[in-house]
């Protein structure tokens, strides 16, 4: 729906950056460089993802196998043994769920691989209302028509069926904040191993 709205408002050559809202990126300079490279590739008509350079053999993330800036395949969350193989190979990146693309590129791929999703999205956007205070950049979708859009992840609906996807290897201080271990990595521990943000009184801890 967002891609349709942006294409209508800004044209098919508009570049969109699709990313999760609940992840953390700590190295903004590196992120800016990666985003600029991704936008450059996207402007050439490529569907682009950011591949997070793995810091350890993680089993909680999907992986991207790559040859340079070309995606070879997306793989599901691996076993510990497979994750160690991926890390040692130097060809695999964590899949952080970020995509960069031209609006017309995405619409063409949706038409090709999942036309039902595109059709339902168009129907929902057609009856959407302008979002107050957004200057025409935002809309509020009608709940009933939006609910008719098939609920299928973009990985299954599109990425696994699309050839020629590009990847930008990225070391950007990324975390999905998806586990206690990942939360612990975001803050320094005191001498007793406690990690605290804000005012706190620790007693016997």
Positions of the model-derived regions?
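Left-handed beta-helix
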Residues: 101-205
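Structured helix-beta-strand junction loops
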Residues: 44-45, 89, 161-164
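A residue-level structural signature of the nucleotidyltransferase/glycosyltransferase Rossmann-like core
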Residues: 16, 72, 91, 98-99, ...
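Nucleotide-activated chemistry modules centered on ATP-dependent adenylation/adenylyltransferase
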Residues: 58-60, 77, 127
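Glycine- and other small-residue-rich loops at beta-strand/loop junctions that grip anionic moieties
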Residues: 50-53, 72-75, 98, 147
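Conserved beta-loop-beta/alpha segment of the NTase-like Rossmann-fold superfamily
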Residues: 1-68, 100-101, 108-113
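A conserved mid-domain beta-alpha-beta active-site/ligand-binding segment of alpha/beta enzyme cores
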Residues: 87, 92-101, 110
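A short, charged helix-loop
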Residues: 66-93
